[in-house]
């Protein structure tokens, strides 16, 4: 399938600039009418929101044509990112100090639909939509975000898929380069008139991305440490213009699969210094095998009285088995005496026998059953229906744009996991026995939720007020069948339940000083529900404030925002990726936490400023974040441990900076982008950073350029990590892990 796809892609490819223009004509009868696909709207203005909002259009995304969403989001102030695998396969994203692990503290959506595998019961984003096929990215923070949930502490991230074009159009692109990278993206579709006032059309889209990886496994130098991804989307759209209402129906089907040879096993400090792209031989079999599908049916009616009814029924399924190194048992006596790879890499000297097995040097042979590799096998299901009614009216001298929404949702995660046992034999893993499937973890976590919101944007003279209220009613359940009842007879079934009712108010305000300057602020409740089976019955709660100012002129735009989030209770969630030494899925109270910060964003066109014959865009984003605990406590959550008042949260950099300058001369263009991330703690603490529990700051430069061969054909080049900076990105869950090295990609795009 891969060779067929690449051959087809090589025939013709659509330029990203044309794609951006196509995107401007989103296939909808509603024109600027409100809808539930977007937060801001492809034609919307983030500045019109009384709060913090950012919109990255298809034109923005085309500059570097990133396949890694973490590189895309470096350009957005207030977004915290912890790199992991170098490709953004399972990104760690937070906002305003929420924590970043598996993006489980923010609300993730695609086309306005919750897209985490199980958004309520298991939100850790082991699936993330592939950004290489997206037409836009929306980020919203602050009080306006109460429209979205269930997580409102930091903000929402909404990825916009390719819309059905208004007219017949096609797009194909191909990239080839270092690490044997092969990436293709193609779509074809459009709308056609089939009767007076009736239109029908659709879209077929395919996306492929693969690379051999930049790490080398000891003894297996030719083995891929990269990935292969395929992603397919189909849409059918039907539009009817009527006397009473203009209506549209859209069916969306999506399927993707991933096979990636990635690991949680990092390196010791000394081995990282010697060769940061080395992988110990015990990780030779680590592999993620995953499939995802999405089905949705949308309906929208724009009535003559300017009222818009939107509805979507949706279902997502995600299955994955991450077969990866779990524990080491030097004497082979049984899993009870085995050590986790996190504890071994944290103290290799004190775990010399286990670390020797991990290294698997030539001439070394372990006992049988010394290496335990786990099938981290999970199936997820999420489904629901959501409605939104929106409209505009004038009343008492003010203009109102009101919205009312309802979502009925259910999701679940089915964990059915087991281990295989191996002997390390001269650097090669030899299987010695298998455990019974389900004998390591055997449970179902589920949630049922009803959410309601109401929001009104009131415009009076130069003032805009946006009060809003969200209500979440959530029932959570964990059904633990136990490790002995692998047939799930229920003989040892333990059921835990929890219910949460939450009112989430928010209020935003904007004052337009004149046509160029506006001031804004807001306050809202930050909320996140507990997990099924949590050790805490408490929700995550905060009171979040923001104040800011914007200035927009003909050729430049600047924005400054200050924020303060006062957590009454911060929750930490145990995942494999935290290396926390706890039961996966359990949650821990962190008590009171204060997060304060500043976000600065600016962009200008130096070409317009100096009346040059070409465009020269300059853009930048700076984030300052300070997050610290306000109480003393001892936690069973590894990244926290023994906490003292004033301890800073892990993996939240104090400073982040992004800057880019480009050129667009019509027939050629390009950009150089630089991002700098401050040093971070890898566990809670204060004072001078300990090199063994921190990651140094780093600067990464990316560059891209394009040349218009014809009006429809572009030749492109993109360089990741131009200076070949060697840097660490994390110490969790098991040892130091590197960022991606320099890679050069060459591309061709054609539109038709």
What is each PLM-predicted segment?
Residues 225-402, 406, 552, 557-559:
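Outer-membrane beta-barrel domain signature, strongest for Gram-negative TonB-dependent receptors
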Residues 22, 26, 390, 395-397, ...:
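Gram-negative outer-membrane beta-barrel transporters
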Residues 70, 74-117:
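Extracytoplasmic beta-strand/coil segments of soluble accessory domains associated
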Residues 21-62, 70, 302:
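Short, acidic, small-residue-rich periplasmic hinge/interaction motif at the N-terminus
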């Amino acid at each position: 399938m891969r060779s067929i796809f690449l051959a087809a892609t090589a025939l013709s490819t659509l330029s990203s600039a044309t794609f951006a223009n196509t995107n401007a004509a989103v296939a909808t009868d509603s024109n600027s009418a409100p809808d539930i696909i977007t937060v801001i709207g492809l034609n919307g203005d983030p500045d019109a929101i009384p709060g913090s909002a950012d919109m990255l259009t298809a034109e923005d995304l085309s500059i570097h044509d990133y396949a890694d969403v973490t590189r895309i989001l470096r350009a957005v102030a207030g977004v915290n990112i912890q790199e992991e695998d170098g490709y953004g396969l399972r990104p760690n994203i937070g906002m305003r100090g929420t924590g970043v692990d598996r993006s489980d503290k923010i609300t993730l959506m695609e086309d306005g639909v919750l897209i985490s595998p199980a958004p309520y019961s298991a939100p850790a984003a082991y699936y993330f939509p592939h950004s290489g096929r997206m037409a836009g990215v929306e980020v919203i923070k602050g009080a306006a975000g109460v429209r979205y949930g269930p997580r409102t502490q930091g903000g929402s991230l909404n990825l916009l898929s390719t819309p059905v074009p208004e007219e017949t159009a096609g797009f194909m692109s191909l990239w080839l380069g270092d690490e044997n990278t092969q990436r293709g993206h193609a779509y074809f579709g459009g709308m056609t008139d089939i009767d007076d006032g009736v239109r029908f059309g659709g879209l077929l889209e395919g996306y492929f991305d693969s690379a051999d990886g930049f790490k080398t496994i000891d003894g297996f130098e030719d083995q891929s440490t990269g990935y292969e991804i395929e992603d397919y989307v189909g849409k059918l759209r039907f539009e009817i213009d009527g006397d009473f209402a203009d209506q549209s129906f859209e069916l969306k089907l999506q399927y993707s699969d991933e096979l990636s040879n990635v690991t949680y096993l990092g390196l010791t400090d000394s081995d990282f210094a010697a060769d940061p792209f080395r992988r110990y031989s015990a990780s030779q079999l680590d592999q993620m095998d995953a499939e995802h599908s999405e089905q949705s049916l949308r309906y929208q009616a724009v009535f003559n009285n300017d009222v818009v009814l939107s509805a979507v029924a949706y279902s997502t399924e995600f299955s994955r088995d991450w077969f990866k190194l779990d524990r080491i048992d030097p004497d082979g006596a049984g899993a009870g005496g085995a050590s986790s790879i996190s504890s071994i890499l944290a103290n290799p000297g004190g775990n010399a026998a286990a670390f020797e097995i991990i290294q698997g040097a030539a001439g070394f042979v372990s006992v049988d059953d010394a290496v335990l590799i786990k099938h981290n096998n999970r199936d997820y299901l999420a489904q629901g229906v959501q409605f939104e009614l929106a409209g505009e009216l004038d009343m008492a001298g003010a203009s109102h744009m009101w919205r009312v929404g309802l979502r009925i949702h259910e999701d679940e995660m089915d964990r059915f996991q087991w281990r295989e046992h191996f002997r390390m034999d001269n650097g090669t893993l030899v299987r010695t026995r298998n455990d019974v499937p389900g004998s390591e973890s055997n449970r179902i976590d589920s949630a049922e939720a009803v959410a309601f919101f109401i929001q009104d944007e009131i415009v009076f003279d130069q003032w805009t007020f946006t009060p809003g209220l969200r209500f979440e009613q959530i029932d959570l359940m964990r059904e633990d069948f136990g490790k002995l009842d692998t047939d799930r007879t229920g003989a040892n079934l333990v059921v835990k339940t929890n219910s949460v009712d939450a009112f989430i108010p928010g209020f935003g305000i904007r004052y337009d000083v004149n046509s160029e300057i506006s001031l804004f602020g807001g306050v809202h409740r930050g909320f996140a529900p507990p997990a099924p089976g949590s050790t805490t019955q408490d929700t995550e709660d905060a009171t979040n404030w923001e104040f800011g100012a914007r200035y927009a002129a003909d050729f430049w735009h600047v924005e400054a925002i200050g924020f303060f989030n006062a957590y009454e209770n911060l929750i930490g969630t145990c995942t494999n990726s935290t290396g926390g030494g706890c039961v996966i899925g359990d949650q821990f109270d962190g008590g009171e936490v204060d997060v304060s910060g500043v976000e600065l964003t600016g962009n200008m066109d130096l070409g317009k400023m100096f009346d040059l014959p070409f465009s020269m865009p300059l853009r930048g984003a700076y984030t300052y974040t300070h997050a610290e605990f306000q109480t003393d406590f001892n936690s069973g959550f590894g990244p926290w441990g023994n906490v003292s008042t004033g301890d800073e949260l892990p993996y939240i950099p104090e400073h982040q900076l992004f800057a880019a300058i480009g050129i667009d001369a019509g027939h050629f263009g390009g950009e150089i982008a630089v991002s700098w991330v401050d040093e971070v703690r890898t566990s809670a603490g204060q004072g001078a950073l300990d090199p063994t529990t921190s990651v140094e700051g780093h600067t990464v430069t990316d560059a891209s350029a394009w040349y218009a061969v014809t009006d429809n054909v572009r030749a492109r080049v993109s360089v990741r990590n131009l200076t070949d900076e060697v840097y660490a990105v994390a110490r969790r869950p098991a040892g130091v892990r590197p960022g991606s090295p320099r890679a050069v990609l060459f591309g061709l795009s054609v539109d038709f």
